[in-house]
C-alpha cells in the first residue's frame, strides 16, 4: 500500500517550470500612429471637435508608439456605426466579433509556439487562455482546443476580464501547473482585440481617449513545462511568482462591461502608484537571491504607457537600455494588455541571440517580469535565463 506522501512525490516534477517556446501574432490591419488621429476623428464623425482632436494628437505624439495592429478595419466600423459613438448600445455586435476572432487569433499564436516547440500537440496537457475581449460559454479555451485539435482530456482554465497584469498571471499559473503535475506541458495563450473597447471620443471622459491612443491587438502563446527533454529547447526558467494589490490604489484602473462595450477608467496618478510600489515588489522577489542592484537584472515590464516607464526608470535609477525590449514592443505594437509581456519575452530572447549575447536575458542571468493593471494589481515573476 502506497502512502499519500509517495503519491504526492510521484505527481511532482523535479526541476523548475521552464518556458519552452513562444509564438506571437497580430491582425493584418496596421495603423500608423502619426496619422491615426485624422483617421479616428473621421471614422467616428467627430472632426468638428477640433480642440479634442488636438488633445488626441498630442496624446498619440507622446505615446512613443509608431504603429499598432487592429482587427477593426474601416470597413467593419462602417458596418457597425454604433462602435463609433461614445456610448451607444453595441455589446451584442461587439461580442459577435470577439467570440470568433479572439480564439482565432489565439490559435495562430499557439500554432507558432507549437511549431517552435517541435513536439506533437498531443503532449499538451493543460490550456490556460486569457482575454479581456469578450465573454462566452463554453469559452475561448474550449474554442481554442477545438481549433487546434487538442485532446478532449486536456485540462482547461479560462481567464476573462483580468486586464493588463494578466500576462504575469498566466505564467504564475503555468508554473504551478507544470511543477505540480509531472510531465505536464502547459499551453498559455493571451489574445486581445480592441473590438470591445473601441469607441468615439468624449470631451468629458478624457481617460477613455487615453485608451484609444494606446491599445492595440495581438496574441501570444507560450509553452511551459518542467524537466525538459533533450528534444526541447529551454528559453527561460520561472523561479518565483507573486501577486499583490498596491495600497491606496482602489479605482486607479477600472474596466466595466456594459451595453456599450468595455469602458476603461484610468486615474492620472497610475504612473506614480506603480513606481511607488515597484521597489517593494522587487525587494520581496530578489532578497532571497541576494540581489539588490536593479541594473544587474534583465527587465520585462508591461508597457502601460510611456509615463509609467519613465517614472519606473527614475524611481529605480535604471539605465535607459534596461527597458529597451519593453519600449520596442510598445513602439511596434502599442499596449496589447495581457499579451504585451509575452511579446517582450519573445523580443528579448530573439534580440539576445541575434546580438550574440551569452544568455536569452541580454547576457544576464536573472530577470524580472512585471505586469500591472486593474486593482491596482501587480504581478512579479522572477526569471532565470539560459545560455543562447
Curated annotation (Swiss-Prot):
* Entry keyword set: Acyltransferase, Flavonoid biosynthesis, Transferase
Looking up Pfam families in the UniProt record yields: Chal_sti_synt_C, Chal_sti_synt_N
Domain of life per record: Eukaryota
Its UniProt entry gives the catalysed reaction(s) as: (E)-4-coumaroyl-CoA + 3 malonyl-CoA + 3 H(+) = 2',4,4',6'-tetrahydroxychalcone + 3 CO2 + 4 CoA
Example of a GO MF term: naringenin-chalcone synthase activity
Active-site residue numbers: 164
Q: In which pathway does it act?
A: Secondary metabolite biosynthesis; flavonoid biosynthesis
What SUPFAM superfamilies does the annotation carry?
A: Thiolase-like
One GO BP annotation here?
polyketide biosynthetic process
Q: E.C. number, please?
A: 2.3.1.74
Task: Provide the top EC class.
Answer: transferase
What this chain does, per the entry, is described as: The primary product of this enzyme is 4,2',4',6'-tetrahydroxychalcone (also termed naringenin-chalcone or chalcone) which can under specific conditions spontaneously isomerize into naringenin.
| Name this polypeptide is given | Chalcone synthase DIV
Q: State the taxonomy lineage.
A: Eukaryota, Viridiplantae, Streptophyta, Embryophyta, Tracheophyta
Gene name of the encoded protein: CHS-DIV
